[in-house]
């Protein structure tokens, strides 16, 4: 259900942007999915296609890019990737992070010094990286 809510927000944003730009058609949408969010791109794509039906975005190409999650320890400065520590997360933890990414601090610590005081450098959240539109008379 979380993916449908994300898809709805993306679709509303795309259509608002298209309207502001006086677009006659939305040709493509590029969406970046942060690895930490653990979003199912297939569900988001299906939901977006359903929500685009009957709009100027119907049939638009949907492109997904996954952004790798990277963390930086505020204590020792060490940077690491989620892929390096993923095995420490069980299914329940991954689901908790999926809904509330900030809880990652409760489940992970710096591999070098053990501190839970780290920042998410990238790979968190979902955002629109690009919208390709067509205006009346353009091709």
From Swiss-Prot:
Keywords: Metal-binding, Nickel, Zinc. PROSITE patterns: HYPA (PS01249). Zn(2+) binds at residues 73, 76, 110, 113. InterPro entries: Hydgase_Ni_incorp_HypA/HybF_CS (IPR020538), HypA/HybF (IPR000688). One of its GO terms (biological process) is protein maturation. It comes from the Archaea. Ni(2+) binds at residue 2. The keyword Transcription regulation does not apply. The keyword Zinc applies. GO terms for molecular function: nickel cation binding; zinc ion binding. Belongs to the HypA/HybF family. HAMAP family: HypA_HybF. NCBIfam families: PRK03824.1. Involved in the maturation of [NiFe] hydrogenases. Required for nickel insertion into the metal center of the hydrogenase. This is Hydrogenase maturation factor HypA. The gene is hypA.
């Amino acid at each position: 259900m979380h993916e449908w809510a994300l898809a709805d927000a993306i679709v509303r944003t795309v259509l608002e942007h298209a309207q502001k730009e006086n677009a006659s058609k939305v040709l493509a949408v590029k969406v970046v999915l942060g690895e930490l969010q653990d979003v199912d791109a297939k569900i988001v794509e299906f939901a977006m296609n359903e929500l685009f039906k009957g709009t100027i975005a119907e049939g638009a190409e949907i492109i997904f890019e996954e952004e790798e999650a990277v963390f930086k320890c505020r204590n020792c400065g060490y940077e690491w990737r989620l892929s390096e520590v993923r095995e420490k997360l069980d299914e329940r933890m991954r689901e908790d992070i999926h809904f509330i990414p900030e809880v990652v601090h409760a489940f992970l610590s710096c591999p070098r010094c053990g501190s839970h005081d780290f920042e998410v450098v990238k790979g968190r959240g979902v955002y629109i990286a690009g919208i390709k539109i067509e205006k009346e008379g353009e091709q």
